[in-house]
Each structure stands twice: as structure tokens, then as C-alpha cells.
């Protein structure tokens, strides 16, 4: 049985501006990578946080059956949101503690739904700190953004 990891990243040129997301999915047996899959996409007008969310959503939605997966993100916004803040938001009808609407609520709801059928471990790592897999996810996010950038 292999262990599945999804390294996710979002990128934005301007905030808001054109943006992209990328996912590097790796199945590992020990240290050996036995399968690799990449995903990427983008939007013409978006934010970095929306692209970080889309990367995580896309990783989970790409899974065809219930799976144990570790999602590795450099976004504290995604990690804290999905592991901590979301519980209060759901209790409060997708409002923050000070009763304001949650930003990107439709994406948080989609992420919440996407993770329900899986056993997900969420891991945060520092971005641009020499993690090869995170750098690959960043390259994919930039490639996803490229068609939407004007020179």
C-alpha cells in the first residue's frame, strides 16, 4: 500500500489579478515515488487565497475513491481554515466570529464537501524554503496562471 501526498500551491500576479493553482500528487512506498500526477488551472481575475483553496479542492476532487491523503500546503490560510476556523464558520452559518460573511465561503464549502469522503491529514510547510515538491507545485501554479497574464 502506498502513501499518497498532494503538494498544493496558488499564485497570483496582483491581488486581485490573474492567478493559478498547481498540485503535485505523489504516491510513495517508503521514500520511492511509485506514481506521479500533476494538476493545474487558473483564472483571469482572482486572489492568492482563492488559488490556494482551488489547489486543495482540485487535489481532493481528483480522487476517484475514498482515500487516505496528506495535503501539504504553504498556505496558513488554508491549513488553519480547514482544520480550525471552519467549525465555527459552519456553526455560525458561514459567518466569522464578528458576524461578517466568511470570505470565499463557496470555496470553503466546496473544500469541506470534497474532504468528507477522505481521511485527510493537513500539513503546513514554509513556502519558498527549498522543499522540492512545494517548488514543483509553485511551478505548476505559475503555469496555470500563464494563459491569463497579459504582457
UniProtKB/Swiss-Prot annotation:
Please name the top-level EC class of this enzyme.
Answer: hydrolase
GO MF annotation: an example:
magnesium ion binding
Q: Where does Mg(2+) 1 bind?
A: 9, 52, 74
An example of a Gene Ontology BP annotation on this entry?
Answer: DNA replication, removal of RNA primer
Subcellular location(s) of the protein: Cytoplasm
**Pfam family membership, one:** RNase_H
Q: Which GO terms describe its cellular component?
A: cytoplasm
Q: What is its EC number?
A: 3.1.26.4
Q: Which gene encodes it?
A: rnhA
Catalytic activity line of the entry: Endonucleolytic cleavage to 5'-phosphomonoester
- The answer to whether the entry has keyword Transport is no
Note the superkingdom of the native organism.
Answer: Bacteria
Q: What is this protein called?
A: Ribonuclease H
Which intervals hold domain RNase H type-1?
A: 1-146
State the UniProt keywords alphabetically.
Cytoplasm, Endonuclease, Hydrolase, Magnesium, Metal-binding, Nuclease
Q: Which residues cross the membrane?
A: none
Q: Which family does it belong to?
A: Belongs to the RNase H family.
Assembly and interactions? Monomer.
Disulfide bond sites: none
Q: What does this protein do?
A: Endonuclease that specifically degrades the RNA of RNA-DNA hybrids.
Q: Which InterPro entries match?
A: RNase_H (IPR050092), RNaseH-like_sf (IPR012337), RNaseH_domain (IPR002156), RNaseH_sf (IPR036397), RNaseHI (IPR022892)
Record-linked PANTHER family: RIBONUCLEASE H1
Q: Which Gene3D superfamilies match?
A: Ribonuclease H-like superfamily/Ribonuclease H
> Which residues are Mg(2+) 2-binding?
9, 138
- What does the note under cofactor report? Binds 1 Mg(2+) ion per subunit. May bind a second metal ion at a regulatory site, or after substrate binding.
Amino acid at each position: 500500500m502506498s502513501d499518497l501526498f498532494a503538494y498544493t500551491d496558488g499564485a497570483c500576479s496582483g491581488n486581485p489579478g490573474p492567478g493559478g493553482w498547481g498540485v503535485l500528487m505523489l504516491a510513495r512506498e517508503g521514500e520511492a515515488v511509485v506514481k506521479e500526477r500533476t494538476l493545474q488551472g487558473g483564472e483571469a481575475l482572482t486572489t492568492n487565497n482563492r488559488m490556494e483553496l482551488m489547489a486543495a479542492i482540485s487535489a481532493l476532487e481528483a480522487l476517484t475513491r475514498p482515500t487516505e491523503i496528506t495535503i501539504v500546503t504553504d498556505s496558513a490560510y488554508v491549513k488553519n481554515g480547514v482544520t480550525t476556523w471552519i467549525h465555527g464558520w459552519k456553526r455560525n452559518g458561514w459567518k466569522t466570529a464578528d458576524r461578517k460573511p466568511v470570505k470565499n465561503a463557496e470555496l470553503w464549502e466546496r473544500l469541506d464537501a470534497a474532504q468528507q469522503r477522505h481521511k485527510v491529514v493537513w500539513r503546513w510547510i514554509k513556502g519558498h524554503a527549498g522543499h522540492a515538491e512545494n517548488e514543483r507545485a509553485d511551478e505548476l501554479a505559475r503555469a496555470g496562471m500563464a494563459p491569463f497574464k497579459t504582457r
